[in-house]
Regions:
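Bacterial N-terminal signal peptides that target proteins for export
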Residues: 2-18
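Extracellular glycoside hydrolase catalytic/binding regions
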Residues: 38, 199-348, 352-370
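Extended, alpha-helix-rich binding/interface surfaces that flank or overlap catalytic cores
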Residues: 332, 336-414
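Bacterial N-terminal signal peptides
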Residues: 16-27
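Active-site beta-strand termini and strand-to-loop segments that position acidic
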Residues: 48-49, 278
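Active-site mouth of glycoside hydrolases
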Residues: 41-47, 53-56, 60-260, 265-273
């Protein structure tokens, strides 16, 4: 039996969970009626509290808390900070701040969560930007004001009530763990070079784990998204990855013995050669693959890793190709008992997502301005009207459901 299995009596009491949350000033307490039904690693499987195999069928909530340029049709403003700066120029800083509050409120709602569950998914993976969870004064721009905590709390509650599991994914770590736009860093993986960034990353995970240690809706903690791009100094950086993972896990385990820790390989999550013998009894390993042939050859190294170390493996991001490929690839994963999380749930004017935001009239003007410094900005009043139309279009009641996409994953439109 796994060391964190409930039969070993290691679940915190309901009163103890509440007391710890309040003592730490976390502002969040787990449900007092929650059952000890954590997902945990058991050999090559993930299992629930009853010992039944849990195969992840997940979707990524991309663009919600970590905006990406291509999901707005921007070619130049690509990172979250670049996108934020563009909106400051487009409609002014004050209106831009109001835009982001509304954006986060409408992009993922309880209706979206219920739809995801009804379609047949059992998991959502939520990318986080550390800036949204930083202490006051710790984040250089001071613009985010720890806005992420109530949003994540709310999502977890919705998922618990809907019967979905949540993978918490640190998509943009302090300093940037990847060296590309979606880690919101300077273009190089400074998480590994700057001691302050490293310590902030460890401290954030400890705080997340302390807050959610008794929350059964959370499946696990995806410690770093796609660390160390192949463009970086991989000979130096790759050996640093598992060392950082060990330190993060030690911090997590000091407050949370319940949740699975999810470890991604280097170079877009593909390279498992950076790993040695597993160092935590409740760990799973996750890889990312896009646009590969849907054959066993593409999975073999991960199957070998799983067999060698007797650990669970699943794919944390994939998709954005076509529906025929989706069908073949998800079936291939399931054939070998591997879970999956496709990317993304919602996108703008796309057939390659679960739902699509209908492009508002005039959005091409915004997209052009976000794609070239030479493109003129629309007049502010016009830009504000277009942005408001986008927010309305992003609401669940107004999106287009991509039934063929959902069907290609072996699921169905409710």
């Amino acid at each position: 039996m796994n060391a964190v299995d409930g039969t070993h009596g290691r679940w915190p009491s309901q009163l103890g969970a509440l007391t710890l949350a309040l003592a730490l000033g976390l502002g969040y307490a787990p449900p007092l009626a929650a059952s000890p039904d954590f997902i945990h690693a058991d050999g090559k499987r993930l299992v629930d509290g009853r010992g039944e195999t849990f195969v992840i069928k997940g979707i990524n909530l991309g663009n919600w808390l970590v905006p990406e340029g291509y999901m707005f049709k921007f070619k130049q403003a690509r990172s979250p900070s670049e996108i934020a700066g563009f909106f400051d120029s487009l409609i002014g800083p004050e209106d831009a701040s109001r835009f982001w509050v509304k954006f986060r409120d409408v992009y993922i709602t309880e209706e979206d969560v219920r739809f995801i569950k009804a379609a047949g998914f059992n998991t959502v993976r939520v990318p986080l930007n550390w800036r949204l969870f930083a202490e006051p004064g710790d984040e250089p721009s001071h613009r985010y004001q720890a806005a992420g905590w109530p949003l994540l709390d709310r999502l977890v509650q919705w998922c618990r009530e809907a019967g979905l599991r949540v993978i918490v994914d640190l998509h943009a770590a302090p300093g940037g763990q990847t060296g590309v736009n979606h880690d919101d860093g300077p273009g190089y993986p400074l998480t590994f070079y700057v001691p302050q960034n490293r310590q902030r990353t460890i401290a954030l995970w400890q705080k997340l784990a302390a807050r959610y240690h008794a929350e059964t809706a959370i499946l696990g903690y995806d410690l770093l998204n796609e660390p160390i791009s192949p463009y970086s100094d991989v000979e130096y950086l790759n050996p640093q990855l598992e060392r950082l993972y060990r330190d993060i896990v030690a911090a997590i385990r000091s407050v949370d013995q319940n949740h699975v820790v999810l470890l991604e390989g280097a170079q877009w999550g593909t390279n498992f050669a950076v790993f040695h013998q597993p160092f935590d009894a409740n760990a799973a390993y996750t890889y990312h693959k896009f646009w590969i042939n849907p054959t066993r050859d593409g999975l073999q190294s991960y199957l070998d890793f799983s067999n060698r170390w007797n650990v669970p493996v699943f794919i944390g991001e994939t998709g954005e190709f076509n529906n025929s490929w989706n069908d073949k690839f998800h079936r291939l994963q399931e054939r070998f008992g591997l879970g999956w999380c496709f990317w993304p749930y919602k996108n703008l004017d796309s057939d390659l997502s679960v739902v699509s935001i209908q492009k508002p009239v005039g959005w091409d003007l915004i997209a052009e301005a976000g794609s070239s410094a030479k493109a003129p900005l629309p007049a502010r009043a016009q830009a504000q009207a277009i942005v408001n139309a986008y927010l309305e279009a992003a609401k669940f009641k107004n999106v287009r459901v991509n039934a063929d996409y959902i069907n290609s994953l072996g699921l169905s439109v409710p």
